[in-house]
UniProtKB/Swiss-Prot annotation:
<keyword id="KW-0539">Nucleus</keyword>
<dbReference type="GO" id="GO:0021555">
    <property type="term" value="P:midbrain-hindbrain boundary morphogenesis"/>
</dbReference>
<dbReference type="Pfam" id="PF00046">
    <property type="entry name" value="Homeodomain"/>
</dbReference>
<keyword id="KW-0238">DNA-binding</keyword>
<protein>
    <recommendedName>
        <fullName>Homeobox protein engrailed-2a</fullName>
    </recommendedName>
</protein>
<dbReference type="InterPro" id="IPR000047">
    <property type="entry name" value="HTH_motif"/>
</dbReference>
<dbReference type="GO" id="GO:0060385">
    <property type="term" value="P:axonogenesis involved in innervation"/>
</dbReference>
<dbReference type="InterPro" id="IPR019737">
    <property type="entry name" value="Homeobox-engrailed_CS"/>
</dbReference>
<comment type="similarity">
    <text>Belongs to the engrailed homeobox family.</text>
</comment>
<dbReference type="GO" id="GO:0009952">
    <property type="term" value="P:anterior/posterior pattern specification"/>
</dbReference>
<feature type="compositionally biased region" description="Basic and acidic residues">
    <location>
        <begin position="65"/>
        <end position="74"/>
    </location>
</feature>
<dbReference type="GO" id="GO:0005634">
    <property type="term" value="C:nucleus"/>
</dbReference>
<dbReference type="GO" id="GO:0000978">
    <property type="term" value="F:RNA polymerase II cis-regulatory region sequence-specific DNA binding"/>
</dbReference>
<dbReference type="GO" id="GO:0030917">
    <property type="term" value="P:midbrain-hindbrain boundary development"/>
</dbReference>
<feature type="compositionally biased region" description="Low complexity">
    <location>
        <begin position="125"/>
        <end position="142"/>
    </location>
</feature>
<dbReference type="GO" id="GO:0001708">
    <property type="term" value="P:cell fate specification"/>
</dbReference>
<dbReference type="InterPro" id="IPR009057">
    <property type="entry name" value="Homeodomain-like_sf"/>
</dbReference>
Length: 265
């Protein structure tokens, strides 16, 4: 007896669940509550890198919409055709034409939602990638790009446009360099006399000499530096500190001329 009662309860519960499912199905299949078919996908790296990634889902959606539209077109019991059909045949033809036109307008209003992913950045997912791949196939390119191409910053797709590159800096020409100062004979004589007196000028002495000769302080400073370098290179005499460091192996910058080296050899 207990087993029979348990089986009867199971049958009643199944019947109640079937009734609830049958009551919910018309709501889900209503035109206002259009439910898209859901497909479980395995998001492995191999699947994502394939060119046909995301195309199957959109194909199922278009098939569902086509089947749904065909059912509506072949539905004989329409509220508008049933009411007008009892009056005049001409009006029936006009009403069927207007109703079909309204359905076409609804379909056209739904169609612009598909190519929206073509103009937006394609890093949103498989749906945007599938729409882009379909558009490429329609244009006749015959090239399928995988999903990861649209998530890279520098992609070779045509929609990315020309790449912006930083302009290269022009190499400094010789004309941009500061020209050498052409000293007059009087200025050279005065500079040589000052150099013989003291090879190193103080700041005050350099300022006064610049005012007397009509030169810049930097010009006088550079002339003195060059003059000291020439004498040092010609004489080959090393500084005492340099000799001390060379003895310890801490200084090996040779400042002697090639002639001195050849003579020593």
């Amino acid at each position: 007896m207990d087993e029979n009662e348990q089986s009867a309860r199971d049958v009643e519960q199944r019947g109640a669940s079937d009734e609830s499912n049958s009551a919910i199905r018309p709501l889900l299949q209503a035109p206002g509550n259009l439910q898209l078919p859901h497909r479980i996908t395995n998001f492995f790296i191999d699947n994502i890198l394939r060119p046909d990634f995301g195309r199957k889902k959109e194909a199922n959606i278009t098939r569902y919409e086509d089947n749904h539209g065909a059912r509506e077109n072949h539905n004989p019991t329409g509220p508008s055709t049933g009411q007008v059909g009892s009056t005049v045949p001409a009006e029936e033809a006009s009403t069927t034409h207007t109703s079909s036109g309204g359905k076409e307008a609804e379909i056209e209003s739904e169609e612009p939602l598909k190519p929206r992913g073509e103009n937006v950045d394609q890093c949103l997912g498989s749906e945007s990638d599938s729409s882009q791949s379909n558009s490429n196939g329609q244009t006749g390119q015959g090239m399928l790009w995988p999903a990861w191409v649209y998530c890279t910053r520098y992609s070779d797709r045509p929609s990315s446009g020309p790449r912006s590159r930083k302009p290269k800096k022009k190499a400094a020409s010789k004309e941009d360099k500061r020209p050498r100062t052409a000293f007059t004979a009087e200025q050279l004589q005065r500079l040589k006399a000052e150099f013989q007196t003291n090879r190193y000028l103080t700041e005050q002495r350099r300022q006064s000499l610049a005012q007397e000769l009509g030169l810049n302080e930097s010009q006088i400073k550079i002339w003195f530096q060059n003059k000291r370098a020439k004498i040092k290179k010609a004489s080959g005499v090393k500084n005492g500190l340099a000799i001390h460091l060379m003895a310890q192996g801490l200084y090996n910058h040779s400042t002697t001329s090639k002639e001195d080296k050849s003579d020593s050899d």
